[in-house]
């Protein structure tokens, strides 16, 4: 998050905070007296700005940082969600699944509403993690030479394994009867999910499943730009595994927790808890391999054929405008 602040502070937030909370001074000032704490991204920033603008909230003010983080996290999550889910829905998701008997009325609208309800609450709950990163309490670092190029690869692997293991057990525990109905059940409202359901869950559910992503950089050093890249990839991956794609038979199925695996999780509840890989499900006996006959599209096509909406091969029948 500090990497994003270093970009947005001098070009966006400095102006905004100077307008909303102007520095109480009548004399031109330079350097740190402008009210801004120095940052690596602004060392070469135009001195004319420092002469004419200033805010009573310096860049290292915890309240300013908190507000900035919430704006970045909220807008960023919404942007990634809308763009990724839209692309997945319109170009990958099989729209015939909307005829499945377990597909809810107005489901997509409900998924989107649930997602936008959850986003700001999750952002607020995760604020302490982001704030700790910005204020230097994590093990994020800037200079690659500090740990070497090989550590980029090693830390990436560790990050994915740590997250996969953590989320597996968090997810599995959420299915315990004493927890499920209070926290995780809202997400399983979508038996036949669309990409819009990726973050359509109880805010506490979204928060606890995100904890491993945040905790990792407090336990293990990671280059901050790599961390931000992987963090964004995680959000996109979460959307992709909700695309309902039941492509089966690929050798990678043995290792990757694919959309097919997660589709089965939504349908059968007690299998495929992993996030990226299948190793945890295999080891702890909760793996269910995707099989062509388990594809929910078969039931959806059957319903469509009964209603005269699909031909014998399952292809949608285009109705004329006169009908």
From Swiss-Prot:
Transmembrane segments: 67-87, 112-132, 150-170
GO BP term, pick one: sterol biosynthetic process
Gene deletion effect: Leads to a severe decrease in ergosterol production and virulence when ERG3A is also deleted. Results in increased production of deoxynivalenol (DON).
E.C. designation(s): 1.14.19.20
Sequence motif Histidine box-3, residues: 262-266
Note: In Fusarium, the biosynthesis pathway of the sterol precursors leading to the prevalent sterol ergosterol differs from yeast. The ringsystem of lanosterol in S.cerevisiae is firstly demethylised in three enzymatic steps leading to the intermediate zymosterol and secondly a methyl group is added to zymosterol by the sterol 24-C-methyltransferase to form fecosterol. In Fusarium, lanosterol is firstly transmethylated by the sterol 24-C-methyltransferase leading to the intermediate eburicol and secondly demethylated in three steps to form fecosterol.
Name under which the protein is recorded: Delta(7)-sterol 5(6)-desaturase ERG3B
Species assigned in the record: Gibberella zeae (strain ATCC MYA-4620 / CBS 123657 / FGSC 9075 / NRRL 31084 / PH-1) (Wheat head blight fungus)
Gene behind the chain: ERG3B
């Amino acid at each position: 998050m500090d990497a994003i602040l270093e970009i947005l502070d001098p070009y966006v937030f400095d102006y905004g905070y100077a307008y909303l909370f102007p520095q109480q001074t009548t004399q031109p000032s330079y350097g740190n007296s402008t009210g801004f704490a120095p940052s690596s991204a602004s060392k070469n920033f135009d001195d004319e700005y420092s002469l004419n603008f200033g805010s009573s909230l310096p860049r290292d003010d915890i309240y300013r940082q908190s507000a900035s983080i919430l704006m970045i996290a909220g807008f960023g999550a919404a942007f990634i969600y809308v763009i990724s889910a839209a692309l997945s829905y319109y170009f990958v998701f099989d729209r015939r699944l909307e005829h499945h008997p377990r597909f809810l009325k107005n489901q997509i609208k409900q998924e989107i509403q649930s997602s936008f309800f959850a986003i700001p609450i999750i952002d607020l709950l995760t604020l302490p993690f982001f704030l700790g990163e910005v204020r230097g309490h994590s093990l994020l670092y800037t200079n690659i030479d500090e740990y070497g190029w090989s550590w980029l690869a090693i830390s990436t692997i560790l990050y994915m394994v740590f997250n996969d293991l953590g989320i597996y057990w968090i997810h599995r525990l959420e299915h315990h009867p004493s927890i499920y109905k209070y926290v995780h059940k809202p997400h399983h409202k979508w038996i036949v999910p669309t990409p819009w359901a990726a973050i359509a869950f109880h805010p506490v559910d979204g928060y606890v499943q995100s904890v491993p992503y945040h905790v990792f950089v407090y336990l293990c050093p990671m280059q901050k730009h790599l961390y931000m890249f992987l963090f964004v990839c995680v959000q996109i991956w979460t959307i992709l595994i909700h695309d309902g794609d039941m492509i089966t038979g690929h050798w990678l199925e043995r290792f990757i927790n694919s959309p097919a695996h997660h589709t089965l999780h939504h349908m059968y509840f007690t299998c495929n808890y992993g996030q990226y890989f299948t190793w945890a499900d295999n080891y702890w006996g909760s793996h269910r391999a995707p099989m062509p006959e388990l594809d929910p599209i078969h039931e959806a096509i059957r319903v469509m054929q009964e209603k005269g909406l699909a031909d014998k091969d399952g292809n949608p029948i285009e109705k004329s405008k006169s009908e």
